Amino acid sequence: MTYSTVNINTPPPYLALASNEKLPTVLSIAGTDPSGGAGVEADVKTITAHRCYAMTCITALNAQTPVKVYSINNTPKEVVSQILDANLQDMKCDVIKTGMLTTAAIEVLHEKLLQLGENRPKLVVDPVLVATSGSSLAGKDIASLITEKIAPFADILTPNIPECFKLLGEDREISKLRDIFEVAKDLAKITKCSNILVKGGHIPWNDEEGKYITDVLYLGAEQRFITFKGNFVNTTHTHGTGCTLASAIASNLARGYSLPQSVYGGIEYVQNAVAIGCDVTKETVKDNGPINHVYAIEIPLEKMLSDECFTASDAVHKKPVKSSLNKIPGGSFYKYLINHPKVKPHWDSYVNHDFVRKVADGSLEPKKFQFFIEQDYLYLVNYARISCIAGSKSPCLEDLEKELVIVECVRNGLCQHERRLREEFGIKDPDYLQKIQRGPALRAYCRYFNDVSRRGNWQELVIALNPCLMGYVHALTKIKDEVTAAEGSVYREWCETYSSSWCHEAMLEGEKLLNHILETYPPEKLDTLVTIYAEVCELEANFWTAALEYE
């Protein structure tokens, strides 16, 4: 028999600076969903995901899954009272969030709010009346009790459309945004809660871009509406979205954000959780599955394993990665990527773009090219930053040095753009470049880069950076003999830069780097690299489209 001793690391030094961290605290008063998608369980996950400390007061023990509510077992009034007393006596509480409330819970909470007076925490009320599955979670008089006893104390009320109708005591036709405004204003009067968030998930709208969701925040004290337009996700898996949104808003308020900021943050968090989704139900569950509350949470062990000073190698052995290169036809990962069904449509749109053709024949309007140069300048600054991050994640000195070479090349590209703006477009203001604003296409691209750099590994980050060089050189080399822009013009000079022998050599090095990436990446995760390449090619095409459409 053998044994070994594994030394446990102390907290990372920087994290240790936050020892005895003061966490914002949120108390959830709601029923349970033992399947984890809604109720108190969803609240605790959401509050934790926002780096807040979650406390609970369970109003009912429910036998519930995304399929339906099988039974509701209300917590006795005296137990609810004891739980609230204990929590409010011994624990700090920045925000209270309510979900499913029973008659007993409403009466107890009403008494506590009166007792607390001006010292009461902020209150976010999600008037849970019906589960997403359609099951009733409240008696017919609960709506009136919430209106009378709880809502007047609330900082914000977050009903969906059906819940608005129950609280108003009548159904209404919703055919335009103004109808939702009227619902919000009338609800504020009836409930005596000045801030109302009407959730629009039940009534998606349509425009030229397709379906979208509109949530409306009414700020009564300011007599102002804020509409939040979000993407419509074509999914039926939305179990627990209401609970999650209210808890996210409560957590943001606990962290000191303003109400509009807190609502925005909550909406985006929920939409991300819906869009990313999770596979946790059995195949028999076809509709109303849970959302992914933990999409932004890091796995502690992954950080430990990536720590160069990790001390527990005896306990955790890294499996050697089997190369996938021998499975790639022709031995070129680059050619495999650009011909992959997921990548090819975006690659073709990118390298055959009209922007390149218009630059090549000199027909592009100067203002559009100036816009491109300005946006590309900001893009290259971000590209350099991301390359530095890639270098910091690289496994060896050789790979780090490659990123430093790339940064130097980017610096040269920035100098060329500065010269073009100065000589071709008469820009003399030395602060001009600092005043340029990112357009929507560039914002989307930079957001993608920043997210991969924050969450991805070295291989994934290199894959994200690769299409820029490969696509430009491919596109300009392809039409090298068709360039008719005037000799000495900025258009011809730009075309000749990317069709030069130097850029072609850099492209060959990029192809070698892609093969190196494939040799060191887990084969079972290959689709991740393919998806990243496809999405970045689409972003590149959109970047050129933005220049063509600039007015």
Swiss-Prot record:
Q: What is its EC number?
A: 2.7.1.49, 2.7.4.7
Which keywords accompany this UniProt record?
Answer: ATP-binding, Kinase, Nucleotide-binding, Thiamine biosynthesis, Transferase
Binding residues for 4-amino-5-hydroxymethyl-2-methylpyrimidine, per the UniProt record? Answer: Q64
Transmembrane region positions? Answer: none
Protein name per the record: Hydroxymethylpyrimidine/phosphomethylpyrimidine kinase THI21
Q: What induces it?
A: By absence of thiamine.
Catalytic activity as recorded in UniProt: 4-amino-5-hydroxymethyl-2-methylpyrimidine + ATP = 4-amino-2-methyl-5-(phosphooxymethyl)pyrimidine + ADP + H(+); 4-amino-2-methyl-5-(phosphooxymethyl)pyrimidine + ATP = 4-amino-2-methyl-5-(diphosphooxymethyl)pyrimidine + ADP
Q: In which pathway does it act?
A: Cofactor biosynthesis; thiamine diphosphate biosynthesis; 4-amino-2-methyl-5-diphosphomethylpyrimidine from 5-amino-1-(5-phospho-D-ribosyl)imidazole: step 2/3; Cofactor biosynthesis; thiamine diphosphate biosynthesis; 4-amino-2-methyl-5-diphosphomethylpyrimidine from 5-amino-1-(5-phospho-D-ribosyl)imidazole: step 3/3
Question: Do the record's keywords include Transferase?
Answer: yes
The molecular function GO annotations come to: ATP binding; hydroxymethylpyrimidine kinase activity; phosphomethylpyrimidine kinase activity; thiaminase activity
Q: Does the keyword Protein transport apply?
A: no
